[in-house]
Amino acid sequence: MQNQKIRIRLKAFDYRLIDQSALEIVDTAKRTGAVVRGPVPLPTRIERFDLLRSPHVNKASRDQFEIRTHQRLMDIIDPTDKTVDALMKLDLPAGVDVEIKLQ
């Protein structure tokens, strides 16, 4: 797998989970002899929602909610077969979305 790059993008609502997962991926890749760039924190996506408190009147009275999606980006340069096997066996927390691209 020479001259290839694995790009890993992590998404989660909890920044502690995403940082822990990123650390596990970096440790696993470095143990197998690959070069890792990152984790690079990407901008946090914030979705805001306004809901009326009352079902009938009082339009001025609203509840405000938000969802924050944290993101990290990592590149693994020149991965070996051992690196790919170790990454596939890695067990990450349930709240982390992992997107992997081979380039």
Swiss-Prot record:
Keywords for this protein: Ribonucleoprotein, Ribosomal protein
GO cellular component, one term: ribosome
Record carries keyword Cytoplasm: no
Source superkingdom: Bacteria
Record-linked InterPro entries: Ribosomal_uS10, Ribosomal_uS10_CS, Ribosomal_uS10_dom, Ribosomal_uS10_dom_sf
Subunit record text: Part of the 30S ribosomal subunit.
Alphabetized PANTHER family for the sequence: 30S RIBOSOMAL PROTEIN S10 FAMILY MEMBER (PTHR11700)
Function recorded in the entry: Involved in the binding of tRNA to the ribosomes.
Stated name of the protein: Small ribosomal subunit protein uS10
Provenance organism: Aromatoleum aromaticum (strain DSM 19018 / LMG 30748 / EbN1)
Gene name of this polypeptide: rpsJ
